[in-house]
Structure formats: structure tokens, C-alpha cells
Amino acid sequence: MKKIVFTGGGSAGHVTPNLAIIPYLKEDNWDISYIGSHQGIEKTIIEKEDIPYYSIASGKLRRYFDLKNIKDPFLVMKGVMDAYVRIRKLKPDVIFSKGGFVSVPVVIGGWLNRVPVLLHESDMTPGLANKIALRFASKIFVTFEEAAKHLPKEKVIYTGSPVREEVLKGNREKALAFLGFSRKKPVITIMGGSLGAKKINETVREALPELLRKYQIVHLCGKGNLDDSLQNKEGYRQFEYVHGELPDILAITDFVISRAGSNAIFEFLTLQKPMLLIPLSKFASRGDQILNAESFERQGYASVLYEEDVTVNSLIKHVEELSHNNEAYNTALKKYNGKEAIQTIIHHISEA
């Protein structure tokens, strides 16, 4: 039986692509383990999947000054030792890393044990963890073809993003019943990320009188961002977040308004949903969402509205543009084959 160790954490985006790959390896009888941090979100997610989980010390990799930067290099070194010992005991055939600060000690620990390491990078440019890990890896899978120019050519394999199988199995009838919607108007699903997005939430709600004339709205507004005055608004349903219902909601969705995190937008792409992307500004991120959104716009998958340009009028104008050019967007979206990503990655895992 072949063995694999997965790693990646710090945010859900460094875990969910692993979840898309794991079921296929289970079918092929791989022995699967996961190494992550003691208290990261990856621990909560993976333990629900009935996969052996091993914790190591980890320090965050920061690009800015913080007093914790004095302590964290020692935590990283401790993490490398923890990972080295754990990997020596597990004896995996390959390590697959999705990035995030916890992955660096695992990648180095694998390299010290002479275990082949494969990386996956979701964004257009590599994050700090993958930049460090790359020198210890044999291959790096990229989600965007344009990402190759930022990486060593001999290590890059373009795959696209692995998408969880359950996302593709939504039921429209269940969504209609859950939301209380009709078939008479198209549905827009609005997602501002797990914490919501204040400006998006406020602008959407200001635009509701105009939007609800033509559309039904599902608004995933983030924790603590519900508006009680809108709870019974016809054609408008708001949730802090949804879990098992999301595939059904996406099945009934005609257009998506969203941030431009890579994992989410590739799910929309695989589902062939035209998108209005409002990326995080450079003031709130390293600018990766802007690059992601602009790539999708160039390929005809999405329209981009920059956060500093978000107003009621600009939002309505972009939604109308999506609707008016729906056929052109759908033609472009149909050219993408999302299922190839998982098969390509599994092939290289098996060959490692």
C-alpha cells in the first residue's frame, strides 16, 4: 500500500484543495495522513474526514514587523524537527503540500527524509510559504497558466484547481425549497468571504430595491452581518454562511458576485457561473486577488469591479452587463474542463 502525507493550513483555502484529491486516493487504497498545526483550521477540517492527523509546532511567516517575529523562527525550527521525526515514522512515498505557514516545516522534514515533495499554488504568484518550500520540492502544480513565469520552468506543471466533488452535485429543487424562491427570476449569489465584506454588504443592501426588480438574491454576508430588517424581504435571503446547502444554492445560481480567492472562483468556473469579482484591495492583501480577477476577466469568465470603485450605481451597471452578455460568458466558461485538474495531480502523485 502506497503512503502519502498531506499538509497545508492556516486558512481553509490551504486545506480544501486537498479535500478534493483525497477521496480519489482513498479509492486507490492509499494510506493517507495529514500533518498540520496544533490549533489551525486544518485540524478541525481534517479530523472530520476520519484521516490520521499529526500536529507540529509552527511559526507564522510574516512580511511585516511584529514582536512575534523574534520567537517564530524558533517555532519553525521546532516544527522541522517535529515533522522530520513524524515523517521518519510514517515512511510516506510522497508529500503533497498546499501551502500556508505550517507546510514549510513539513516540506523541509520530508526533504531531509528524502521523500519526494509536490506543491500546489493556487494564486498567480506564489505565497511566502511556497517560495521557501519550492527549493525543497520536485514539482509545483499551478492553478493559473500565467503563474509559470514566476517559477522555475523545470518544476512547473499547469493543472488548474482541484474542485471538491460535492460542489458539483447540487440539486436545484432542494435549493428552491430551501430558499423559498420561484423559477420566474434569475438568481444572484453574493459571497464576501468567511468574514463578510463590509463595503460589499452595505452596497448590495442599498441596491436591493433595483436588483430585486429583476433578480432573486442569496446573500452570504459573513458572521455577525445579518440585517434583521431584511429577514422577510421577498426574493432576498441572507445567511452568515452555509455549509451543506451551498452546492444546491450554486446549482440554482445564474450569476455570482464574489471576492476573488482562487479556490472559490475556480469552483464557480467549473460550475460555469458568470462572475462579477470584487477583489480585496492591495491595502488589505498582497494583491493576489486582483491578479486572479484580472486573469479571469481576460479569459472572458468574469467582470471585475475594484473595491475602491464600488457604488450602488457601479454594482447595478456591472450586474446588468453580466446579464446582457450572459451568452458570451457562458461560451467562454464552457471551454474550461475542471475535471482534468484532479486527474493530472493524481497521475503525478502516483509517479512521484
UniProtKB/Swiss-Prot annotation:
User: Where would you find this protein in the cell?
Assistant: Cell membrane
Give the Enzyme Commission number: 2.4.1.227
What is the main EC category here?
transferase
Q: Which Gene3D superfamilies match?
A: Glycogen Phosphorylase B
Q: How does it sit in the membrane?
A: Peripheral membrane protein
CDD domains per record = GT28_MurG
State any GO BP term from the record.
cell wall organization
Give the superkingdom in one word: Bacteria
Extract one GO cellular component term from the record: plasma membrane
Q: Which UniProt keywords apply?
A: Cell cycle, Cell division, Cell membrane, Cell shape, Cell wall biogenesis/degradation, Glycosyltransferase, Membrane, Peptidoglycan synthesis, Transferase
Catalytic activity, reaction form: di-trans,octa-cis-undecaprenyl diphospho-N-acetyl-alpha-D-muramoyl-L-alanyl-D-glutamyl-meso-2,6-diaminopimeloyl-D-alanyl-D-alanine + UDP-N-acetyl-alpha-D-glucosamine = di-trans,octa-cis-undecaprenyl diphospho-[N-acetyl-alpha-D-glucosaminyl-(1->4)]-N-acetyl-alpha-D-muramoyl-L-alanyl-D-glutamyl-meso-2,6-diaminopimeloyl-D-alanyl-D-alanine + UDP + H(+)
- Predominant cellular place of this UniProt entry's protein: membrane
The record ties this protein, via InterPro entries, to:
GlcNAc_MurG, Glyco_trans_28_C, GlycoTrans_28_N
Pathway note: Cell wall biogenesis; peptidoglycan biosynthesis
**Molecular functions per Gene Ontology:** UDP-N-acetyl-D-glucosamine:N-acetylmuramoyl-L-alanyl-D-glutamyl-meso-2,6-diaminopimelyl-D-alanyl-D-alanine-diphosphoundecaprenol 4-beta-N-acetylglucosaminlytransferase activity; undecaprenyldiphospho-muramoylpentapeptide beta-N-acetylglucosaminyltransferase activity
Which residues are recorded as binding UDP-N-acetyl-alpha-D-glucosamine? 11-13, 164, 194, 289
The family line of this record is: Belongs to the glycosyltransferase 28 family. MurG subfamily.
- HAMAP family, alphabetized: MurG (MF_00033)
> NCBIfam families per the record?
murG, PRK12446.1
Q: What does this protein do?
A: Cell wall formation. Catalyzes the transfer of a GlcNAc subunit on undecaprenyl-pyrophosphoryl-MurNAc-pentapeptide (lipid intermediate I) to form undecaprenyl-pyrophosphoryl-MurNAc-(pentapeptide)GlcNAc (lipid intermediate II).
Protein name (record) = UDP-N-acetylglucosamine--N-acetylmuramyl-(pentapeptide) pyrophosphoryl-undecaprenol N-acetylglucosamine transferase 3
